[in-house]
Every structure is written in structure tokens, then in C-alpha cells.
């Protein structure tokens, strides 16, 4: 799983649950859960929406890790 994310940590910082985060981002709670678990890689559009919610860059939330 080369795409790591810090979504859960950022979500905790602003005190929203997965359902509320999904509403803010325009997706379901299940999608947020899948992203946090690393089971789903968001589209570029969704990654940008999520970053905008936290007023940070996409790279602050999502990291690409090279496979060795």
C-alpha cells in the first residue's frame, strides 16, 4: 500500500467523525473509512477537497511511499 494518509489525525484535530467528514467532502462515511484504512485511494479531486477542508496541501495528508 504505497499511499499513506493522515486523514484520521487531521479529522481528530478538528473534532469531526467519519460521517461528518464524509458530508464535508461530499462522500459517504464508508469512503472516509476506506481511505483511512488504506483500502481506497481517493481521486485527485477528492484529495484536493479533503486538503481544502483542513487548509493544508494534499501532501500534508497523503504520502506516496515508494515500494522497495
Describe every region a protein language model picked out.
Residues 5-24:
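Short basic helix-loop element that most often maps to the first helix and adjoining turn
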Residues 62-68:
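Short, charged recognition helix plus adjacent turn
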Residues 19, 30, 59:
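Residues within helix-turn-helix
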Residues 37, 56, 66:
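Short, conserved catalytic or interaction motifs in soluble domains
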Residues 10, 24-25, 35, 64:
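Residues in the recognition helix of alpha-helical DNA-binding motifs
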Residues 27-41:
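Recognition helix of helix-turn-helix/homeodomain-like DNA-binding domains
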Residues 45-60:
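DNA major-groove recognition helix of helix-turn-helix/homeodomain DNA-binding modules
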Amino acid at each position: 500500500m504505497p499511499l499513506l494518509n493522515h486523514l484520521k489525525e487531521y479529522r481528530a484535530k478538528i473534532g469531526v467523525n467519519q460521517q461528518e467528514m464524509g458530508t464535508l467532502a461530499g462522500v459517504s462515511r464508508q469512503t472516509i473509512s476506506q481511505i483511512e484504512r488504506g483500502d481506497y485511494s481517493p481521486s485527485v479531486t477528492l484529495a484536493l477537497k479533503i486538503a481544502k477542508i483542513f487548509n493544508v496541501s494534499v501532501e500534508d495528508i497523503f504520502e506516496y511511499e515508494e515500494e522497495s
